[in-house]
């Protein structure tokens, strides 16, 4: 994480137990942007490691067990690392993602070093607008999402890959026809997630049928 390390050395904040840089003003809720320059300057001393309360709240709250007393010791378990990245998420983490389209943020919400912010507006984006074969509906949803998180993050295939997992976790069989179609798409993450979601929904439906019988 070179950007985080650069910000730390620049004295912007401290490293929390969850591995994130925490600043006095914004906590860990900010984005680091680097700019290359040939201007030389001495790094301030205020960027030394330390300062985290080590209360363990983030470790207890992490749904995937990525954080422990040593910090973010198992980043491969952090579900945020596999959200909207266009990669196949490990099967053990797919259910843990729940109904999150992007971001987990649980470790940030429970951190006592986070400043209090007013709740932001909700995006109001429905899953049925993403898990659909209606291209105009999907395009409108992508445009809306792009306005909030940027076009780079809201790439159509990345969104489809994550939306497929949400469909699988939704328990709603109405998504099965779309997932059946997506399972044959050439984009690996979309196809694999769609197959997993289809199997999960089908199994859930079978279990409900057996209980009814």
Predicted features and spans:
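Alpha-helical adaptor scaffolds
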Residues: 127-157, 164
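Amphipathic alpha-helical scaffolding segments comprising HEAT/armadillo-like alpha-solenoid repeats
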Residues: 141-145, 172-183, 203-213
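Short coil turns that connect the paired helices of HEAT/ARM alpha-solenoid repeats
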Residues: 84, 150-155, 181-190, 213
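Structural detector for internal amphipathic alpha-helices that build alpha-solenoid repeat scaffolds
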Residues: 160-170, 192-203
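Alpha-helix N-cap/helix-start positions at coil->helix boundaries
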Residues: 118, 156-158, 173, 188-189
